[in-house]
From Swiss-Prot:
Pathway: Pyrimidine metabolism; UMP biosynthesis via de novo pathway; (S)-dihydroorotate from bicarbonate: step 3/3
Annotated positions binding substrate: 61-63, 93, 277, 308, 322-323
InterPro entries reported for this sequence: Amidohydro-rel, DHOase, DHOase/Allantoinase_Hydrolase, Dihydroorotase_CS, Metal-dep_hydrolase_composite, Metal_Hydrolase
Protein name: Dihydroorotase
Family: Belongs to the metallo-dependent hydrolases superfamily. DHOase family. Class I DHOase subfamily.
Cofactor note text: Binds 2 Zn(2+) ions per subunit.
Residues that, per the record, bind Zn(2+) 1: 59, 61, 151, 304
Gene name for this UniProt entry: pyrC
Lineage, highest ranks first: Bacteria, Bacillati, Bacillota, Bacilli, Bacillales
Binding site for Zn(2+) 2: 151, 178, 231
CC cofactor: Zn(2+)
GO biological process: 'de novo' UMP biosynthetic process; purine nucleobase catabolic process
Organism: Bacillus cereus (strain 03BB102)
Hydrolase found in the keyword field: yes
Length: 428
């Protein structure tokens, strides 16, 4: 099916929002201009809505194989499509871990069979993510590994991390890290700060993250490797990354929507839906994340979509697993709480969710350019809705944002020229 989207707006190559039509033919973007006419195309009047590149998320958890009670490739990618994401990068904390040919081939077959959006899997740095034996990077790259990470289990051994970075550099691949110094975690379930003190909970100190980033940055410099920092959360981490960039070290970083919108002061009670890793930090950390995003220290926004069951989250804040679901709330949360409040512009938000992650990792995504694959999201910037977890397509309903009123909701997502998801009656 060919589609002609009429009367939309998009961000042009100069970074300005302008009026446009957009023609999709044979799965590709055929033309982006005003007043397009075309035969043999279904005309869809978007009536002034935003025509955006499909959103790109480099940090997601799909849980399959091994955790299908939390999420599946089918449910997770359908939730991603509903959130406007057309390309997502799946972390390797599955069971089994994609750490060898057999496991990666199985994962890729599952993706091919079930995914509603483009899914790029990470390969594990170490076998079973336990940090003792490096995986075969060459084989994992051959089978389509997006980059290498041990995800939520930071590589604690410096010699192992250096060896991994050297091997990745030879393959022109990135090493991606969840940064925690295990000896400083302190069995914490929240940030070490006012909230932990008030509720008598063990806290995770900010330095637990920043000291690990500092170590890895120096290792990356020694290996001449692209090193990407997951979900930055502290003022100290922002400072370390900023200094490294100024020194010319190949480091990039991401921040989550929840760390941009919330801090520990916003946690109403010992609610496990506010438990994520890294935890919500203090006000100064929150301000530093915004500053880092605006000055280029932090390159992109990624959801860290981490679904869990209601039963798991009901165990209480100390025993419940870390993580919140993120696909279906990311854009409206960021648009409402950052763009509408004048903290960043709409153009910047689009870049942080599209071209910046795509460019950082060399993906042919993130831009509406003629000849490229038609991965597109239509967003109604005027639509206001209340976040209702019962309507999520993800199996995970674990969100701290239930009841929040937000503007800027995706209404249609196109992947490879085909409609992957659309809101009923939104485009008539």
């Amino acid at each position: 099916m060919n589609y002609l989207f009429k009367n939309g707006r998009y961000m042009n190559e100069e970074g300005k929002i302008v009026a446009t039509d957009l023609l999709v033919q044979d799965g590709k973007i055929a033309k982006v201009a005003e007043n397009i006419t075309a035969d043999n195309a279904e005309v869809i009047d978007v009536n002034g809505k935003l025509i955006a590149p499909g959103l790109v998320d480099v940090h997601v958890h799909l849980r399959e194989p091994g955790g299908e009670h939390k999420e599946t490739i089918e449910t997770g990618t359908l939730a991603a499509a509903k959130g406007g994401f057309t390309t997502i990068c799946a972390m390797p904390n599955t069971r089994p871990v994609p750490d060898c040919r057999e496991h990666m081939e199985d994962l890729q077959n599952r993706i091919k069979e079930k995914a509603h959006v483009n899914v790029l899997p990470y390969g594990a740095i170490t076998v079973r993510q336990v940090g003792s034996e490096m995986t075969d990077f060459e084989t994992l790259k051959e089978l389509g590994a997006f980059a290498f990470t041990d995800d939520g289990v930071g590589v604690q051994d410096a010699s192992m991390m250096l060896a991994a970075m050297k091997r990745a550099a030879k393959l022109n691949m990135a090493v991606v890290a969840h940064c925690e110094e295990n000896t400083l975690i302190n069995k914490g379930c929240v940030h070490e700060g006012k909230f932990s003190e008030k509720h008598g909970l063990n806290g995770i100190p900010s330095v637990c993250e920043s000291v690990h980033i500092a170590r890895d940055i120096l290792l990356a410099e020694a290996a001449d490797c692209h090193y990407h920092v997951c979900h930055v959360s502290t003022k100290g981490s922002v400072r370390v990354i900023r200094d490294a960039k100024r020194a010319g070290i190949k480091v990039t970083a991401e921040v989550t929507p929840h760390h941009l919108v919330l801090c520990e002061d916003d946690i109403p009670s010992a609610d496990p839906n506010f438990k994520m890793n890294p935890p919500l930090r203090g006000k100064e950390d929150h301000a530093a994340l915004i500053e880092g995003l605006l000055d280029g220290t932090i390159d992109m926004i990624a959801t860290d979509h981490a679904p869990h069951t209601a039963e798991e989250k009901a165990q209480g804040i100390e025993r419940a697993p870390f993580g919140i679901t993120g696909f279906e709330t990311a854009f409206p949360l960021l648009y409402t709480n950052l763009v509408k409040k004048g903290i960043i512009t709409l153009e910047q938000l689009i870049q942080f969710l599209t071209e910046k992650p795509a460019d950082t990792f060399g993906l042919e995504a993130g831009r509406l350019k003629e000849g490229r694959t038609a991965d597109i999201t239509i967003i109604d910037l005027e639509q206001e809705e209340e976040i209702d977890p019962t309507t999520f397509l993800s199996k995970g309903k674990n969100t701290p944002f239930a009841g929040w009123k937000c503007q800027g909701w995706p209404v249609m997502t196109i992947v490879g020229g085909k409609i992957a998801w659309q809101k009923e009656s939104a485009l008539v």
